[in-house]
Curated annotation (Swiss-Prot):
SUPFAM superfamilies hit by this protein: N-acetylmuramoyl-L-alanine amidase-like
Top-level division of the source organism's lineage: Bacteria
PANTHER family listed in its UniProt record: 1,6-ANHYDRO-N-ACETYLMURAMYL-L-ALANINE AMIDASE AMPD, N-ACETYLMURAMOYL-L-ALANINE AMIDASE AMID
Biological process, per Gene Ontology: cell wall organization; peptidoglycan catabolic process; peptidoglycan turnover
Protein name: 1,6-anhydro-N-acetylmuramyl-L-alanine amidase AmpD
Function: Involved in cell wall peptidoglycan recycling. Specifically cleaves the amide bond between the lactyl group of N-acetylmuramic acid and the alpha-amino group of the L-alanine in degradation products containing an anhydro N-acetylmuramyl moiety.
Domain N-acetylmuramoyl-L-alanine amidase: from-to ranges: 29-167
Enzyme nomenclature, EC number: 3.5.1.28
Amino acid sequence: MLPDKGWLVEARRVPSPHYDCRPDDEKPSLLVVHNISLPPGEFGGPWIDALFTGTIDPDAHPFFAEIAHLRVSAHCLIRRDGEIVQYVPFDKRAWHAGVSNYQGRERCNDFSIGIELEGTDTLAYTDAQYQQLAAVTRTLIASYPAIADNMTGHCNIAPDRKTDPGPAFDWPRFRALVALSSHKEMT
C-alpha cells in the first residue's frame, strides 16, 4: 500500500479539483475520520465521486440540490466493501474539515488527512472498512509519524457542526487494529 507521489498504489484514483497546497513546510500530523453516504443512508453508486469532483447532478436527488454548490473533497473514501478511492494526494490539502480546531489549532485542513468511510453515524461499519482504514493509517504513520498520536473524528474538530463518524464507529477496535498492524510489521 506504499504511496506513489502521495497516492496509494492500491487505491482507485478519482482526482478531485477541490484541493490546494498545504502551507509551506506543513506535513500532515492529524488523521480525521469522517462518514458519508449519498443520498443520505444509501450506499454504492457514483454520487460520492461526483460530489468530490464537482460533478454531482442537483436534479438526480432532492438532497443533491442542497449540496451541489459545495467544493469539498477528502483524501480517501473507504467503501462498505473495503474499496479505497483516493481523490487528493496526501501531500496536498483536501477540503474536508471546514471550520475546525484540534487541540487549540485552527484550520485542520492545513495539517490533516481526511478519510471518509461510506456509512452513517448509527450503522455499524464493516470489517473490511476497519481493516482497510487500519492499513491506510499504518501507511500514513510510516510517512507522517505524528499521526500515530493524533487520530480523531470530524465531530471532535467541529463539534458544533458535525457528528461523524458517529457512535457507530468503534475507536478502540480501530486503534487496536492499527497497533496490531504496526506490531506485525515490526516482528
